[in-house]
Amino acid sequence: TSADIIAEPWFNYQRDCLKHIAEEAQLARIIVVTSGKGGVGKTTTSAAIAMGLAKKGHKTVVIDFDVGLRNLDLILGCERRVVYDFINVINGEASINQALIRDKNCNQLYILPASQTRDKDALTQEGVGKVLEELSKEFDYIVCDSPAGIEKGANLALYFADDAFVVTNPEISSVRDSDRMLGILSSKSRRAERNEEPIKEYLLLTRYDSDRVKSGEMLGLDDVQEILSL
C-alpha cells in the first residue's frame, strides 16, 4: 500500500513505525506529523514520536510549525521557558542554541517552539531549509509538528519531510482530508522535485474504538482502506 495504517493508540505505534525509521536512518531524518483537519491528536502524536525516539537514545528535536497557535510547548511542559522561537531563528534575531529548549525529563529531547505573535508569512522555504540544515548537523531526528490543513506552515513542513505521519480520526470527512494530504506528500515534496525515493507515509488512526466499529457508529479499517483506495 502507499501508506501504512496504524489503528492503535499513539503510545503503541512506536513498535511498528519508529522501528522502521530508526533502522533506516543514517543521516538526520526529518519526520513530519500532519493532518487534514485539526483536533485529531496531531501535536500529541508529534510529542510522542519525539519522546519515543529520544528515550531510545536518539538525539531528537521537535519543531512547532504552527505559528500563532503554538501548543507543543504546553504539551511538553516547557511553556514558561520559551524566550526565543522558530521565527526569531529564521530572521537572525537569535541563534538555534538560544531558541532550543532541552526537555527536563529526557536529555536527548529538544524543542524549538513556534512564535505566538508573528504572522505565518514569516516562514519562508529558504529560512526553514537553513534551520533544518543546521539542525541536521547536531541531531539524529527532526520531528516537525505541522499545522492542520494546507496552509503555508504545513506545506513547508511537508516539503522537507523524509517520513510522514498523517493523523486522522475514523470519520469520513477526516479520512477524506487525509487523502488530500497524502496527495500533497507524493507531489509537492523536495523528494518529489528531485525524483528521489518517495516520502515514507504512515496513516495513524486516533480515537479508534473497536466496539463502536462493531456497532456501526465508527469507520473500521476496511472502510478507511476503501475510502483511500489502499
Indicate residue ranges for each PLM-predicted region.
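Conserved catalytic-core segment of NTP-binding enzymes
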Residues: 136-137, 141, 147-230
